[in-house]
From Swiss-Prot:
This is UDP-N-acetylmuramate--L-alanine ligase. SUPFAM superfamilies: MurCD N-terminal domain, MurD-like peptide ligases, catalytic domain, MurD-like peptide ligases, peptide-binding domain. It comes from Rickettsia typhi (strain ATCC VR-144 / Wilmington). GO terms for molecular function: ATP binding; UDP-N-acetylmuramate-L-alanine ligase activity. It is an enzyme of class 6 (ligase). The gene is murC.
Length: 498
């Protein structure tokens, strides 16, 4: 009996409890199960956008972790981010309540579906969203479980009416290799999650299994602009692989004639599929998001659309319908004719891609790039310390905050201040500064922002919440400064604040 079919019978699973339900991956699976008719609840340490959204659907949310939260539950779902000393896990073990990993629950939802699994070190969320848009434009309405909020839908997960399921496949703990996908996407492979894998070669091996575990009739889509992915593809002969890139001249799908601005990217595509005679050119594809990395993400979606015979019109329409993903180069405010961007970038390669996009736009506007970065996890900074020192070259001015721990214990010698100090000592950046308090961002913007500037706030921690409050904070600061002038009338601002 399949989980997707169980509700059609008289059988019941009881209550399914998610520990860390506010996480983007966990909230998506919980939402799908709720929409399928299952009783779902969950707990998290703090309230956030995801917990509020789930509560609005009638899902019970506990703030804080306590053993009484799972008093009447039948199953407990966890992710690798949940520690074994969590009181709810301890209680579940004591009472022998089945504990299910997030990837196992995702795999169950994907069983007997034609599933597209999107993996890679970076770009998964945007690529998943783009593929979903193409499916809908082709008249196929998939179930989607994404790692970020899709702006078109205001959610990261939704039920579809077709037999397709598109999911972001998280590689952080190797459980993604057990996902029963028909189509597998690899956007790139970089040293990441080494606290789990310990060795980069083990991580690469997991991606190899991700492809070779496909059924013989499935296929993979891989970006061979990335040298690690190219080597992996060259070593695999037992599965069909469609390749894409911008620089790789031998890729099956290549973007060229590229133009990008602050709001969009336009490019042409050359398609030369294996075992298909001739070459197809698609002209003037436009995606409403800037950046070379997003063009690569689009090529992955095009590869799926071409292989499934969506047609050129559906592909173009799908991209036209794409409204972006929350926290992926998202404009949150303007100040003094400078644009303030919120971005999820927290790995050196993501930071380089985001800043390269910002630099390209700033150059067109005769502006500068001001980067404010909140490091995420002590272990990530430790393993990639040298890479972090080198990834901010496109920032004209750089501020680095304290590390957002994300539940980790501090590591001696690994701090935001030490990163800035090493960058300065090694002359990797001559305008790198340490920012002790996020509140000081307001002063940084007021002091430095000028017309044409791109102010990029990056990180996977709480810097996003701060970025989304900047409009209010900057306005409050202006009122405070202006109120010192006795001739200044602040009444016009009162309505804005309220």
């Amino acid at each position: 009996m399949l989980l997707l079919e169980l509700k059609k019978t008289n059988q019941t699973l009881g209550t399914i409890h998610f520990i860390g339900i506010g996480g983007v991956g966990m909230s998506g699976i919980a939402e799908i199960l709720h929409n399928l008719g299952y009783k779902v609840q969950g707990s998290d340490l703090v309230e956030n956008y995801n917990t509020k959204r789930l509560e609005s659907y009638g899902i019970k949310i506990f703030l804080g972790h306590a053993k009484q939260n799972i008093k009447n539950v039948s199953y407990v779902v966890i992710s690798s981010a949940i520690h074994q000393n969590n009181p709810e896990i301890k209680e579940a073990l004591e009472r022998k309540i089945p504990i299910i990993r997030r990837a196992e629950m995702l795999a169950e939802l994907m069983r007997l579906k034609c599933s597209v699994a999107v993996s890679g070190s970076h770009g998964k969320t945007t690529t998943t969203s783009l593929i979903a848009c193409l499916f809908e434009a082709a008249g196929l309405y998939p179930t989607v479980i994404n790692g970020g909020i899709i702006n078109n839908k205001s959610t990261n997960a939704y039920l579809g009416s077709s037999n397709y399921l598109i999911a972001e496949a998280d590689e952080s703990d190797a459980t993604f290799i057990h996902i029963p996908s028909t189509i597998a996407i690899i956007t790139n492979i970089d040293p990441e999650h080494l606290d789990y894998y310990q060795d980069f070669e083990i991580l690469i091996g997991a991606f190899r299994s991700f492809i070779t575990n496909l059924p013989f009739y499935g296929f993979a889509v891989c970006c061979i602009d990335h040298k690690i992915v190219r080597k992996l593809v060259d070593d695999i002969t037992e599965r069909k692989i469609i390749t894409y890139g911008i620089d790789a001249e031998d890729a099956h799908i290549i973007a060229f004639n590229i133009n990008t601005d602050i709001a969009s990217s336009t490019f042409d595509v050359k398609i030369s599929l294996p075992n298909v005679l001739g070459t197809t050119i698609i002209e003037k594809i436009t995606i409403p998001t800037p950046g070379r990395h997003n063009i690569l993400n689009s090529l992955a979606a095009i590869a799926v659309g071409i292989e499934l015979d969506f047609g050129i019109k559906a592909i173009k329409n799908g991209f036209n319908n794409f409204k972006g993903v929350k926290r992926r180069f998202t404009k949150v405010a303007e100040y003094n004719q400078a644009v303030i961007i919120d971005d999820y970038a927290h790995h050196p390669e993501e930071i380089k891609a985001t800043l390269a996009t910002a630099k390209n736009i700033a150059n067109q506007q005769n502006g500068k790039v001001i980067a404010i970065f909140q490091p995420h996890r002590y272990s990530r900074i430790k393993y990639l310390f040298d890479d972090f020192m080198l990834c901010f070259a496109d920032a004209d001015i750089l501020y680095i905050t304290n590390i957002y721990a994300a539940g980790e214990k501090p590591i001696e010698g690994i701090t935001g201040q030490s990163l800035v100090d090493k960058m300065t000592q090694n002359k990797y950046h001559d305008k790198a500064n340490f920012l002790a308090e996020l509140d000081d961002v307001v002063s940084v913007i007021i002091d430095h922002a000028a017309s044409g500037d791109m102010i990029i706030m990056m990180g996977a921690g709480n810097i996003s919440s701060f970025a989304n409050e900047l409009d209010r904070r900057l306005l409050s600061q202006e009122i405070l400064a202006s109120s010192q002038n006795t001739d200044f009338d602040t009444s016009s601002y009162d309505k804005v604040i309220r």
